[in-house]
Amino acid sequence: MIIFGVDPGFGILGYGVLSVSGNSFQHVSHGTIQTEKQQNIALRLKVLYEELSNVIDNFKPSEIAMEKLFFSRNITTAISVGEARGIVLLLAAQRNIPVFEYTPHEIKKAVTGSGKASKKDVQQMIKILLNLKELPKPDDAADGLAIAWCHCAVRNITRRFS
């Protein structure tokens, strides 16, 4: 089973791909999709849609995990992240891929054991948990992996108690 984790963003969208077999999670890929600030909003959304569509079609995930939108003091940022989330949800719906959402607190707790962990702590734990040679970079891609890991961990716990 392939799990696709998404850290939604308008300027930079991070993703992480894990393969799940039983209780084992293996790193497959991670990366980012970036848009240019100078481009108009419609063109940036088109770039996100087309590039993310290609990535999803390449990895063919069974499930998508995404960070929940949390209240932001910067309303413009919250709106643009919401637009990026809409693209993820649309692509998933078009492919009949279920989407699961997690708060930043849930993700940090699943990866590090603490819901108050720093980004650096999350990166370091993802490196250890997935036996990566280097810290996953950039932060957005590391967050995508952390979101995928969180979903895998929740799936395993849920499966055990079913």
Curated annotation (Swiss-Prot):
Keyword Disulfide bond (UniProt): no
The keyword Plastid is assigned to this record: no
Cofactor(s) the protein needs: Mg(2+)
Residues reported in the UniProt entry to bind Mg(2+) 2: E67
Main localization of the protein described in the UniProt heading: cytoplasm
UniProt keyword annotations, A-Z: Cytoplasm, DNA damage, DNA recombination, DNA repair, DNA-binding, Endonuclease, Hydrolase, Magnesium, Metal-binding, Nuclease
Annotated binding of Mg(2+) 1, by residue: D7, D140
GO MF entry, a single one: DNA binding
Oligomeric form and interacting partners: Homodimer which binds Holliday junction (HJ) DNA. The HJ becomes 2-fold symmetrical on binding to RuvC with unstacked arms; it has a different conformation from HJ DNA in complex with RuvA. In the full resolvosome a probable DNA-RuvA(4)-RuvB(12)-RuvC(2) complex forms which resolves the HJ.
Record's protein name: Crossover junction endodeoxyribonuclease RuvC
Top-level taxonomy: Bacteria, Thermotogati, Thermotogota, Thermotogae, Thermotogales
